[in-house]
């Protein structure tokens, strides 16, 4: 007996077009929950000892602007993905950061400045900037979800 008919049947069953349709609000809620969980997990890792005596919210205005700029969300994530490789014991954060890309909206225009700079191997700077970036993403996602749900 040939396996081809069975494979074709399986392909038809898992094809997105034949599955129950997902409403836009359902997909927004689901994706937001996944993104929110990833953000929370990264923040949990960032809060683990050894904690420095620095204030994590103390970023200069330029860094804050760069981390909040919508068109730099993806380039900033790429910068964090590069920087995490130079840190010790950050493999858990690295694996979550790789999965965070689908949570980011596409840029509406080309960035007008360079993405965030993070010193290689500087755990404190990485932690401070990534925490601010994730809080910014979380706030933006919450606003977008609220607006989208209000429309429906």
From Swiss-Prot:
Q: A single Gene Ontology molecular function, please? A: cytokine activity
A GO CC term assigned to this protein in UniProt: extracellular space
Question: In what tissue types does this protein appear?
Answer: Activated T-cells, mast cells, natural killer cells.
Predominant localisation class: secreted
What is the phylogenetic placement of the source species in the record?
Answer: Eukaryota, Metazoa, Chordata, Craniata, Vertebrata
On whether Membrane is a keyword of this UniProt record, the answer is no
Signal peptide range equals 1-19
Taxonomically, the superkingdom here is: Eukaryota
Identification of the protein by name: Interleukin-3
Q: Name one Pfam family in it.
A: IL3
Q: Where in the cell is it found?
A: Secreted
């Amino acid at each position: 007996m040939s396996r081809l008919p069975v494979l074709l049947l399986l392909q038809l069953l898992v094809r997105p077009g034949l599955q129950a349709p997902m409403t836009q609000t359902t997909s927004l809620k689901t994706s937001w929950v996944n993104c929110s969980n990833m953000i929370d997990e990264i923040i949990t890792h960032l809060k683990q000892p050894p904690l420095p005596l620095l204030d994590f919210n103390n970023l200069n205005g330029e860094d804050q602007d760069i981390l909040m700029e919508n068109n730099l969300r993806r380039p900033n994530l790429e910068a964090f993905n590069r920087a995490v490789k130079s840190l010790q014991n950050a493999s858990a954060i690295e694996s979550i950061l790789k999965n965070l890309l689908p949570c980011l909206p596409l840029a509406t225009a080309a960035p007008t400045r360079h993405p965030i700079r993070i010193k290689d191997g500087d755990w404190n700077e990485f932690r401070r900037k990534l925490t601010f970036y994730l809080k910014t993403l979380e706030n933006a996602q919450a606003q977008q979800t609220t607006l989208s749900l209000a429309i429906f």
